[in-house]
């Protein structure tokens, strides 16, 4: 008797600057899925945050002009309906598992995870709270600091307090090399390296177009960029380390290097570091994974200063799966193939869903028989 295939909804797109990156990741994941195990339905979130039905999404996935297909789909939809952004989910047969490949907003900030939770369906990766905390650089740093995990010093600037943070104060507290970052953006979007007052003013103005919270971080001169992949739930494992070297003259691994022209970027797989540094980075990554409550997977980025001291940069709960993405490549050199990695991620999502299903959320679990009634011994 043939075993029933798992029906997987593969979601990509979204309203972030990483929309097209998401599409490339989704293609690679689809190609890596064992079609003897999985029936795969494609769904795309448009740049407006509207979920298209399977038919329109598949057309775009297969290469038809996105703008044209989206406009045709919109004409058939009641965009003013209360559930218009997710109504397309009702047009497909029962879904067993959700596999979001949505980078940035909607996908990594806890939004779609909340949707899957409401639908009572398993999904890949971290849950609502972990996704939200890991996507917000300010919240991430607060948790890392509480857990005693080394990261760069920073100041949080908001519209309410920005007048307090002049360039002279920034230099006094953080030094004369800083990075300005929107709190909730991925793929280095809106990030500026700053070492003059003029650059600082320009960077702040740009960063505030992406978020109402902006981080100003102390910079590290001539850092080595090292990454590590994590896989698992309660007992995660770590991959071998990978390294990134940007072209001479480029200041850091920015959006251009990641997705527009990566021809000059060198990926060291594995990167050669001494055993003590490798162990310290691995230990820091696993500790951060636990502190942030991550599940399934994460890619965690590090900067190593000229003295060989590692600083945890950023965690990524839904790392890229493009042709140059390091998350799957680091697992490949660690002995886990692309298709096996996808199988494991799906199984981890199912296991976490089953574990959460054992938890109690009713009043009896709190020692209360009914609302307003307290039980006394």
From Swiss-Prot:
This is D-alanine--D-alanine ligase. InterPro entries: ATP-grasp (IPR011761), ATP_grasp_subdomain_1 (IPR013815), D-Ala_lig_Van_CS (IPR000291), D_ala_D_ala (IPR005905), Dala_Dala_lig_C (IPR011095), Dala_Dala_lig_N (IPR011127), PreATP-grasp_dom_sf (IPR016185). Residues 141-347 form the ATP-grasp domain. ATP binds at residues 171-226. Belongs to the D-alanine--D-alanine ligase family. GO terms for biological process: cell wall organization; peptidoglycan biosynthetic process; regulation of cell shape. Cell wall formation. It comes from Limosilactobacillus fermentum (strain NBRC 3956 / LMG 18251) (Lactobacillus fermentum). It is found in: Cytoplasm. One of its GO terms (cellular component) is cytosol.
